[in-house]
A protein has these predicted regions:
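Compact, glycine/acidic-enriched structural inserts
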Residues: 120-138
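Short acidic-glycine loop/turn motifs at beta-strand connectors
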Residues: 106-108
């Protein structure tokens, strides 16, 4: 993890869940196959979920400030799949923007954002680029 993310966790521990075990991460990998990038797995070991800047980062654990019903990567991904906003099995919802649009890990490790208008845009090359952007925006 980059030092600025570690500094945020040290300064605002209530914004970060505890890291999770490799067995918990493996359960996620088993369900979502190629969508759980190595960078995202590294983040989950550091924090099972977080709020960085104004963005939730969904993991396998919840942060108290998150929505009580949609607060883990599995719950949020299932919600957007069920709503038909993302194609089932192709994306992993790791965050949402201020309009409630999903921000997802793609099969190639890039991070894409979907709009309610049906558009998909690749915004970051990888997960670390996304969380660095979140930290810089805070």
């Amino acid at each position: 993890m980059k030092s600025n993310i570690i500094d945020l966790k040290n300064s605002y521990p209530f914004m970060f869940a505890e890291g999770v075990s490799q067995s918990e991460i493996q359960k996620l990998v088993d369900v979502y196959h190629g969508l759980v990038s190595s960078q995202y797995q590294e983040f989950l070991k550091f924090s099972g979920g977080a709020i960085i800047g104004a963005y939730p980062l969904y993991g396998v654990s919840s942060v108290e400030l998150m929505d009580a019903h949609f607060n883990t990567v599995s719950k949020v991904t299932n919600k957007y799949e069920d709503d038909g906003m993302i194609e089932k099995g192709r994306f992993l919802v790791i965050s949402e923007n201020h309009a409630g649009d999903p921000i997802c890990l793609n099969m190639d490790g890039s991070v894409v954002e979907f709009s309610h208008d049906g558009f998909q845009e690749k915004l970051w090359e990888d997960f670390n680029g996304f969380i660095e952007w979140c930290a810089d925006a805070s």
